[in-house]
């Protein structure tokens, strides 16, 4: 009898102590899309962004990814025009962290290798000087037609500078506080039909 009790006690000890319970580990992430709806088919110039921007910090490069931001341009033709010019200029480009740190990121905008700046216009099309706009060339060909013409192209967006608190610049993005930055990147387009 003693052997049976001892055997049962040993089985209980082995089954109760040798097994560790693994805890489940879960992680969650949220994807957010900006959403608005607008239709304008009567304005002389309409520029529509085709998507939103999302920059992710990559630890391996200690920096943020760049993004291609596509846009659609529609113009109304002017049959009296002899030349057409389309330019762009950066208006806003600061993202601010959504906490109390005041940390900021500045977004750079590039069009076909040329920086789009706040201080001057970037020429995208200038038919009088032979700048026909690459992917926007349908506009250079249709600016003097009697109907509307559309074309699509894109900017390259990248994080070009940042601060830890709104004033202290960082040279190493790994020193930025953890969190999410939000804001608008706005580019103004100007079209000129010359008669």
From Swiss-Prot:
It is found in: Fimbrium. Its main location: other. Disulfide bonds: none annotated. Belongs to the EcpA/MatB fimbrillin family. Self-associates. Forms filaments. Interacts with EcpD. Keywords: Fimbrium, Signal. Residues 1-22 form the signal peptide. Disruption phenotype: Mutants do not express ECP and are defective in biofilm formation. The keyword Transcription regulation does not apply. The keyword Signal applies. This is Common pilus major fimbrillin subunit EcpA. Pfam families: MatB. It comes from Escherichia coli O18:K1:H7 (strain IHE3034 / ExPEC).
